[in-house]
Amino acid sequence: TNKALRFIRPDVQAMHAYVVQHSVGMVKLDAMENPFTLSPELQAKLGERLGAVEINRYPGARIDDLKNALAQYVDLPAGFGLMLGNGSDELISLLSQACAVPGAQDRAKVVAPEPGFVMYGMSAQLQGLQYIGVPLQADFALDEAAMSAAIAQHEPAIVYIAYPNNPTANLWDADTIRRLITQVSAYGGLVVMDEAYQPFSSKSWLDEIRQHPAANAHVLLMRTLSKFGLAGIRLGYMLAPTALINEIDKLRPPYNVSVLNAECALFALEHTEVFAQQAAV
């Protein structure tokens, strides 16, 4: 046994690594990627854009341009801020970091329905938070009573609600979500509405946030450009009231989004109709 392993956390050594299976010769459905490539004309235009990027420089003003473009794309509500992540995975990790109190006797908790996105639990574990998964009902419906009981018992720092759910595709009942959000608000917890699959959905919780901002003051809304059609560039974004997003953004590593990724995203946002047509298929 390598002696240096004694300094690697036991819980990390006990974990199984997240493995991406090779998909050569297979119809790959598990990752829900956009199967369409860009037209030759758009590929050429994107190539020209990327060729002009100053890759000798650290990311700068173009990151701000991207944030502004995304804010315009989602019609960011007044008083809200927006931050970028290297995929939603990084944003989930930053949320766990923000809520993990070093040396705390009572560990912060994370609650989410299961089956759900694996990174909720994995990021919680890696940051020393306790993860509580709440099983869905037999028909994959959200078990409101069980979720409410878990929230009452554990008072989690974070409650994740995927809208629609990954991997079951459920779009949870809005009244149920409102009640859970109100319950979490009573003790000061956070609710993260994960809208990774919003391009395939007929609804967005952002409309609810606009209509009832006070009731959603502790809600963060997270999205990714992966299901938009850009899984290869690894770009997620999260929006919330400015005071809240500013605290999470303090933990973001500098230059976490590359200039090439930012330019790809800006190009895509200039051609949203193309990606919307692909998602509709």
Tell where the protein language model's regions lie, with residue ranges.
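A general structural signal for well-ordered alpha-helical segments in protein cores
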Residues: 9, 39, 43, 63-67, ...
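Structural signal for conserved beta-strand scaffold positions within catalytic alpha/beta enzyme cores
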Residues: 14, 28, 84, 112, ...
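PLP-dependent aminotransferase class I/II
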Residues: 39, 218-281
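Structural scaffold positions in well-ordered secondary structure
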Residues: 29, 159, 194-196, 222, ...
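N-terminal "arm"/small-domain region of PLP-dependent enzymes with the aminotransferase-like
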Residues: 1-57, 155
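Glycine-rich beta-alpha junction loops
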Residues: 33, 165, 226
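Short acidic/glycine-rich loop or secondary-structure boundary segments that cap or lie
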Residues: 37-38, 168, 196, 200-201, ...
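Conserved core of the PLP fold type I
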Residues: 54-185, 192, 197-216
